[in-house]
């Protein structure tokens, strides 16, 4: 090997040529005063020593690129690219490669420093032949070219002469930005590689087709260029530097381009990582000052902030350096490419990669994208102004004068009642002056029109803080205020009323019209008139459409519970039946409490009887002609309908009134005609209500029992007995009718009240009789006819009291059915056999006063009284209302004429379940009364009591 000191030889040795893979003796010379730096090779070392001519001399000043090649089968290859073509050498090891490559790059830089020439460090250089296809012939790019790749562009350098054999001009060198390349690909069998250019490229849109040495080179070109296109590019850096007179920044470390949105349409590069590493190695060899690693870019939106450790390899530039741009600089104006003043300290900008995202937001390095320091818009501390500015403005000025200045932004949740209306007006005026500096104009919104007609601070008239409204909500609220009005126009300061739920602001509930919620001192002066649906105060009427207190749309105040009506049902829907004309007659009857009700309402009018008990009554006009009476029932129950069964509800009727009054007259005035017995008073005249005081005299009853004809001769009547005594029935009834006619006018009022009481029911303690009549055979008891004429009294004979166990008793207060009352007058003419019972007729109280007849009968066995039941108690337990569970019997109590002052008899005769064998004929002219206990079926057997 020749000495370096001879002629500037630096390195020498046996190396292989890339094309032929033959060993040659290569000698590298430095630049001297006599010659320039060059690379020579000989066939053998012997020829070199003999000073033979070298096979080829490659001057380093003609090489625009010296780099390592990675796309060949050999691992250690160095390529020297020049306008004459590329020359490649193959080394034995990595150390030999690094030694030769470093020396070549040093010599190249020395030449560049001496001549002032800047060499572009290309990452990859391929020698291709551009075919006459696509736009190549039109633009003059045909023949052999070097395809040189950098991180930002793809450069084609002409090899050979500048003209074609046909005399056409060839482009010596052209640079195409990677951002203007739409796509690239290769055809493996034909060793073809192509690129599709966009309209922003310097050549225009079109395709470039080029042929490589082999298919491996085409594949490597495709993968490498595609990887560079996917990385961050610095395509417009050179143009920016030209405008700003700054040197090229291509020697600075680069950052790979991020993936675009249409990354799925691009072929997958399987050798990206390996090629990137090789590119960095080649770059570091060709440019020793570029040993910094490029920063990779994520493929998705950032999901977290980076740490300081992640940004250790990042390099930031001060104000003296321009930053890269991610847009095409071919036609961009200078104003859009301003310089960035980003800080020099490391900021965490690296983001995590994500495969799911198809869109990548690239960071702009221009000055317009940054402030002096970068702002992390993903920070949780960053304010997002999503709220309406009206809300902030109204909340800022909604403060109370009593609060401190430190609580300006606090909205009080308690009622605020101004003590003076003038003070309130001044307060609103001050707030308007403060709001004058804040004007928010919404030209296309409907709230502008309302500002001319309405007061926007009208919500503060009730002393409340100013409500913060969003855009559009004030319109509906002002209409609602106009509809409701304000009660404070009358000089009052009403409190806030309960809040409406969503959707209920369109109407005013009836319960709110009937319930005026005002200050505790003034609430007693108001009266609600349900029939007119208005609110009255000292004679002044405020109808529904007039001004009343404004409803609040906020939450109700819990502190105003004492001002609200105590009626717990006031918030429910009320059904007012007070205007119904067909219910006026029974309006005074309420919840089956007529005895107590009449005592409280009717004036007390004592009867001229021998008893100390009185009957409370009123005039016939007040009771039956529909005069409205003042009741003492709780006012809360006034507007509700009693939910009783409709079929059993009683309605007063006057159809059967004359006949019933006749019977009352007969009963009341039979005793004065006789001298033997006093007359009882009628305190409570009811079919099922017997005064308990009349049953206390048990000793007197025992004395009457000994003289009763029932104890002497119990008898049984046959059907023929009733028929044979029809003439006696005529005479008896004629006498009784004459007596009743004479006393008609005197007892009209008392009879009406007695009829009214008969239609109503008292307490449960006085409603029931003592026994159930369930015998299987008839027991017929009669009295002698001379006993009836002897005392001149109305005798009663119980033919039968039939109890049908198949019928279930309803509640006792529901037995007065309107249907039965209408038919009761027709049943008075039915025929039946009756027997006298003086002991029972002495003091019984019944619904109808019925006279009986004296019938002839045969005497029966004296052993009959063993079937008689003694009446011991009148207070029976309440019966079940069920129609299925327990069959119950019907009971009857008889109001007998007042022939005696003693208690009623204790013995009644059992009847049979059977119907009477033969009934008396109604054509005899006698008057009969029938008590029918059947409420469900008129055809069923019933208990019948008849008057003879």
From Swiss-Prot:
A biological process from GO: determination of adult lifespan
Keywords in alphabetical order: Differentiation, Growth regulation, Oogenesis, Phosphoprotein, Repeat
Comp. bias (Low complexity): 936-948
GO MF annotation terms: insulin receptor binding; insulin-like growth factor receptor binding; phosphatidylinositol 3-kinase binding
PTM annotation (Phosphotyrosine): residues: 410, 891, 928
Compositionally biased spans, kind Polar residues: 304-329, 529-556
Motif (YXXM motif 1): 410-413
Region (Disordered): 247-270, 304-373, 528-559, 703-734, 907-948
InterPro entries to which the protein is assigned, alphabetical: IRS, IRS_PTB, PH-like_dom_sf, PH_domain
Segments forming domain PH: 8-109
Top-level taxon of the source organism: Eukaryota
Phosphoserine sites (modified residues): 286-287, 342, 554, 912, 915
UniProt keyword annotation of Phosphoprotein present: yes
Matching SMART domains: IRS (SM01244), PH (SM00233), PTBI (SM00310)
A cellular component term, taken from the record's GO annotations: plasma membrane
Binding partners and assembly: Bindings to phosphatidylinositol 3-kinase and SHP2.
PANTHER family documented for this protein: INSULIN RECEPTOR SUBSTRATE, INSULIN RECEPTOR SUBSTRATE 1
UniProt protein name: Insulin receptor substrate 1
Annotated source species: Drosophila erecta
Lineage: Eukaryota, Metazoa, Ecdysozoa, Arthropoda, Hexapoda
